[in-house]
From Swiss-Prot:
Its main location: secreted. Keywords: Amidation, Disulfide bond, Hormone, Secreted. InterPro entries: Neurohypophysial_hormone_CS. GO terms for cellular component: extracellular region. It comes from Cyprinus carpio (Common carp). Disulfide bonds join C1-C6. It is found in: Secreted. This is Isotocin. GO terms for molecular function: neurohypophyseal hormone activity. PROSITE patterns: NEUROHYPOPHYS_HORM. Belongs to the vasopressin/oxytocin family. Antidiuretic hormone.
Length: 9
């Protein structure tokens, strides 16, 4: 992911 929006993006 880009920011902290995903669990393990």
């Amino acid at each position: 992911c880009y920011i902290s929006n995903c669990p393990i993006g």
